[in-house]
Curated annotation (Swiss-Prot):
NCBIfam families: PRK00179.1 (NF001211). Coiled coil: none annotated. The active site is at E410, H441, K569. HAMAP family: G6P_isomerase. It catalyses: alpha-D-glucose 6-phosphate = beta-D-fructose 6-phosphate. This is Glucose-6-phosphate isomerase. It is found in: Cytoplasm. Its main location: cytoplasm. Pathway: Carbohydrate degradation; glycolysis; D-glyceraldehyde 3-phosphate and glycerone phosphate from D-glucose: step 2/4. The gene is PGI.
Length: 605
């Protein structure tokens, strides 16, 4: 293994020197295996089973053979490349579809076949079937992983511990329907007899990112006089600013916490309850039963919900086989249903169900989430690409990058395999992004001309929800231009001719050429839907969920736990009393002691 990468590094450095590139770029890229080994050494014995697979070794040799080929050269050899390296899914609704073009990547038929073989050798399909069948694929917590059951519109039986879970799923969905229709119609009244016009969702992580993203994305389908707010940060500013915007007599607070013990969520919930009670008392209004009229819970802890004052009739359940970052399809999506209504929420579920069926039944080479994942494996593990940009060219999707950041990084940000050995390769990428065209004026410079290869997912719509002049054509012209520019680039001779035409000459031209040259061959996927409807959004999210599954299965990690978020939370619980006391501390490391003591001596809380 080490000999292979040493030779490969030498080969690429020599090649890039010939092509005029900086050798250090190639050197940095191919130090990746050594970095993985160094960082995971403390975790114990390395699990090298992935590296020994025939398909993995085949991909290593194919990278050495084709890694320096330009993407454009593939198009020159194959005029049907776009058709052969794209996949379209019918969403079974009007003219809507979901389309993936992955032709602008360093992929040819040999590489594609090897990637497909890798998925087969790693048992991806068997793992996916086990998840769909309700087996306990979350190995470290011994739990099933069944977000697919939440959008199982076929109602096929899904058995967990001998019980079909679909009855419970449908009962909660019916409960959500009844509640949201009462609120949306004005039937539900607050303490002073007024209807509800403000919804404040209090949650964090998956209890916040999903509902925020979906309500923003589906705003054209929302009830416009019902205003949704989201409070997640334990920073009191977040709650304070929301409370300034709502009339408490017309507000319902949704407390989203499975255990009803989450520190950030319960802190915010108690502040909201205190604000309501203070308001009512200050205005001479009875507080009896007020919490039950202005608070509902998304939880499984009946006792804690009752203690808080919430009527347990208005407690919406979900189950331990629903992970937080996969929970927007569950009762956690109550704020979404309040915003867009029951029928549109069912459409949202249906879009995901269509993608589930496609993923479960379609051969790998025509399977959209599979190929999206395999292209990502190719760049992450063979090109050394550590990041993934998500670039939605639709303003309604402006929160999608943050949502996918949690989905991907919390799921696959793991350094240990399910066999409890240290991983031998890079796992989950760093995910970031911004709505187009804003990102073009922020970080695209690095994507085009920086020293890192950053695979990009461009996401756009054929139809716009808002026909304003030529705005949509202008937006999509940028979408298509950016994907082309990343691939094609601009060579030195093209730059020289442009500079001559501009009136520049001599050394000035030669000095400027390197600054205006684009190497090209920067990879991108293009993902299109006809229109951003609830069904289309459901399909997009499910596509990325299954992409995460495929990559996690190949890396041999558990994509469904999140132990990495625990340590800091535990330490925070021990530090909080120290901040409340204001005393000088000495039981942490030198830096942490210094920070706490500086805070305690200067804070005036």
């Amino acid at each position: 293994m080490s000999d292979y990468f040493s030779k490969l590094k030498e080969h690429v450095v020599e090649s890039t020197e010939i092509n005029g590139c900086t050798p250090s770029i190639a050197t940095a890229t191919f130090n990746a295996p050594y970095e993985v080994a160094r960082k995971t050494k403390m975790l114990g014995v390395t699990d090298s089973s992935l590296l020994n697979l025939p398909a993995w070794k085949r991909l290593q040799s194919l990278y050495e053979k084709y890694g320096n080929d330009s993407i454009l050269s593939h198009f020159e050899k194959d005029h049907q490349r776009f058709q052969r390296y794209s996949i379209e899914i019918d969403l079974h609704s009007d003219d809507n579809f979901l389309f993936l073009d992955y032709s602008k990547s360093h992929i040819n038929d040999e590489i594609k076949d090897a990637l497909v073989a890798l998925a087969e050798e790693r048992g991806v399909r068997a793992f996916a079937k086990a998840m769909f069948d309700g087996q306990r694929v979350n190995s470290t917590e011994n739990r099933a992983v069944l977000h697919v059951a939440l959008r199982n519109r076929s109602n096929r039986p899904i058995i967990v511990d001998g019980k079909d879970v679909m009855s419970d799923v449908n009962n909660v969905l019916a409960q959500m329907k009844d509640f949201t229709e009462r609120v949306r119609s004005g039937e539900w009244k607050g303490q002073t007899g007024k209807s509800i016009y403000n919804i404040v969702n209090i949650g964090i992580g998956g209890s916040d990112l999903g509902p925020v993203m979906v309500t923003e994305a589906l705003k054209p389908f929302s009830k416009r006089d019902l205003h949704c707010f989201f409070v997640s940060n334990v920073d009191g500013t977040h709650m304070a600013e929301v409370l300034k915007q709502v009339n408490l007599e017309e507000t319902i607070f949704i407390i989203a916490s499975k255990t009803f013990t989450t520190q950030e969520t319960l802190t915010n919930a108690m502040s909201a309850r205190n604000a309501l009670m203070s308001y009512l008392k200050e205005n001479g209004i009875s507080t009896d039963g007020a919490v039950a009229k202005h608070f509902v819970a998304l939880s499984t802890n009946t006792e804690k919900v009752r203690e808080f004052g919430i009527d347990t009739v208005n407690m919406f359940a979900f189950w331990d086989w629903v992970g937080g970052r996969y929970s927007v399809w569950s009762a956690i999506g109550l704020s979404v249903m309040l915003s867009i209504g029951y029928d549109n929420f069912v459409e949202f579920l249906t879009g995901a169900h269509v993608m589930d069926n496609h993923f479960a039944s379609t051969p790998t080479e025509q399977n959209l989430p599979m190929m999206l994942a395999l292209v990502g494996i190719w760049y992450n593990n063979f090109f050394g690409s550590e990041t993934q940009a998500v670039l939605p060219y639709d303003q309604y999707l402006w929160r999608l990058p943050a949502y996918l950041q949690q989905l991907d990084m919390e799921s696959n940000g793991k350094g240990v395999t399910k066999k409890s050995g240290a991983v031998a390769v890079q796992t989950g990428p760093i995910v970031f992004g911004e709505a187009g065209t804003n990102g073009q004026h922020a970080f695209y410079q690095l994507i085009h001309q920086g020293t890192k290869i950053i695979p990009c997912d461009f996401i756009g719509c054929v139809q716009t929800q808002n026909r304003v002049g030529d705005h949509h054509r202008t937006l999509m012209s940028n979408f298509f231009a950016q994907t082309e520019a990343l691939m094609v680039g601009k060579n030195a001779e093209e730059v020289r001719q442009e500079l001559v035409k501009s009136g520049m000459s001599g050394d000035a031209i030669e000095n400027m050429i390197p600054h205006k040259t684009f190497t090209g061959s920067r990879p991108s996927n293009s993902i299109l839907v006809n229109a951003l409807t609830p069904r289309a959004l459901g399909a997009i999210i499910a596509m990325y969920e299954h992409k995460v599954l495929v990559q996690g299965a190949i890396w041999g990690i558990n994509s469904y736990d999140q132990w990495g978020v625990e340590l800091g939370k535990v330490l925070a619980k021990s530090i909080l009393p120290q901040l409340k006391s204001g005393n000088i501390v000495s039981d942490h490391d030198g830096s942490t002691n210094g920070l706490i003591n500086m805070f305690n001596t200067r804070a005036h809380l």
